[in-house]
Amino acid sequence: MSFEISREQYASLYGPTTGDAIRLADTELFAVVEEDLTTPGEEAVFGGGKVIRDGMGQNSQLVRDVGVPDLVITNVVVIDWTGIYKADIAVRDAHIVAIGKAGNPHTMDGVDIVIGVATDVISGEGKILTAGGIDTHVHFISPDQIETALSSGLTTMIGGGTGPSESSKATTITPGEWNIHTMLRSFEHWPMNFGLLGKGHGSSISPMAEQIRAGAIGLKVHEDWGATPSSINTALQVADEYDVQVAIHTDTLNESGFVEDTRAAIDGRVIHTFHTEGAGGGHAPDIIELAQYPNILPASTNPTLPYTTNTVEEHVDMLMVAHHLNADLPEDVAFADSRIRQETIAAEDVLQDMGIFSMTSSDSQAMGRVGEVLIRTWQVADSMKRQRGPLPEDEGTAGDNHRIKRYVSKYTINPAIAHGIADSVGSVEVGKFADLVLWEPQFFGVKPDLVIKGGQMVYGVVGDPNGSIPTPQPRWYRRSFGAYGQAVHTSAITFMSEASIRAGLPRALGLQKTIRAVHGIRDLTKADMRHNGETPRLEVDPETYEVRVDGEPVTCEPQDVLPMAQRYFLF
């Protein structure tokens, strides 16, 4: 016998279902549930008098060894590059093992995830689940960045640095074997996934190759060390030999060549371009043109995202500090001014919205904010919907699903693909490491409810530890048990080169964290960037800096009010 209830009542009990729309934070973006993998009338719900009890929704006979999951997240709406859908998510041995309908097949229909005695439950009713975010442009200057990143929904940090040295503040590089080994040992303490970039500067292969053998997952070419054609070519030769990525911050001053010369040095090989608009650094004024080519994997850093009335004004002073410039030297001031172009910044949001720019990242403490990768990505999406309307694929629908999938891909699956770690992280798919972030819809993209690493809860909003229940004020982010002791070894991954792992380096360094190799990078093209693989013709007018896509000018207006801002933060 069936029992009918209203959609509103159903959503209040079990969360939204197919056809329901969810507003994301205070934006104008609405996610519509495309599919519900649970069974109506057979929902698995935990609590007093609820379903998941002995002999009801829980099977009390099966032992863990037959495949009973360690954790089930019930009735949650997933927002991922793969789709926007409702499901139960099963985690076992730190990995996602099933997506579908959880419960007890002895008493319920349609069960493909068996909840057993060994199973913990997180209630996802009315909440949103995403993959953990990936920041590929991290200057490792302060360890406090890691807590800030976790509390924003990031679970993987890729970049370089050794602490607050001048070169680390500027160049996202961990140079040389000794520094790389020191940083790899430091990462043992943190419930965060890490990968290091070595110094991609040298006229011979050996000094760069030894950094890959020392555990770096790629090389960084940066103008502050000299982004010369020779360095670019040599770094890419090493990358091709070891199957790693090269990230590049090109030559703003055009001292060693123009954008055409950099493109010639790259010579069709895949490369990850940082802050491809140029305010963060790169050939002035036309670095943005590189994003049209299929071997270029272009990203933005978040200080220019979204374009606001304050963006240009804050950038000059920020740049002077980040790149060790002297405000009393006219040459240094001119260098800074050349990078800050209102016209290309105004085009950047549109290029992100069109799927021409594929990724977002932070440039943490070096002209970017590590805790705002997600916020600023979604602020761009909101600004573009307000200014450009629905994307063509979303026309005539009740929501913004195509745009939402495009933007969530920018900080999840696409950076994972770019750095050869997509078989481990970057999406909510069976077989992936269970790096998951749970959100209340009204706080989506701003403040996570719970951060899960490798199936373990590592960070979440919890109340007074002396409270009689978990919710009394003050409620703030606190570490959970997966962030302590030896649990960190299984809740987080250190990514290293295949060559270093084959040589036994993790054991030699005494590393205890889960180790994974990067791979499958050198054959990538922009077509591999999910929902963000467009390659139209791009041009920048050398005098006016106007940006054109297939001959048409692109720009947007600066925003003076943003969502996901003052409503959520005091400062």
UniProtKB/Swiss-Prot annotation:
Entry's Gene Ontology cellular component terms: cytoplasm
EC class of the enzyme, as a word: hydrolase
PROSITE patterns named among the record's database cross-references: UREASE_1 (PS01120), UREASE_3 (PS51368)
Active site residues according to the UniProt entry: 323 (proton donor)
GO biological process assignments: urea catabolic process
CC cofactor note: Binds 2 nickel ions per subunit.
EC number: 3.5.1.5
Keywords noted in UniProt: Cytoplasm, Hydrolase, Metal-binding, Nickel
Post-translational note: Carboxylation allows a single lysine to coordinate two nickel ions.
Catalytic activity as recorded in UniProt: urea + 2 H2O + H(+) = hydrogencarbonate + 2 NH4(+)
Residue intervals of the Urease domain: 132-571
The keyword Cytoplasm appears for this protein: yes
Cofactor: Ni cation
Transmembrane segments: none
Cellular localisation: Cytoplasm
Residues bound to Ni(2+) 2: 220, 249, 275
Positions that bind Ni(2+) 1: 137, 139, 220, 363
Pathway: Nitrogen metabolism; urea degradation; CO(2) and NH(3) from urea (urease route): step 1/1
Protein family: Belongs to the metallo-dependent hydrolases superfamily. Urease alpha subunit family.
Subunit: Heterotrimer of UreA (gamma), UreB (beta) and UreC (alpha) subunits. Three heterotrimers associate to form the active enzyme.
Protein known as: Urease subunit alpha
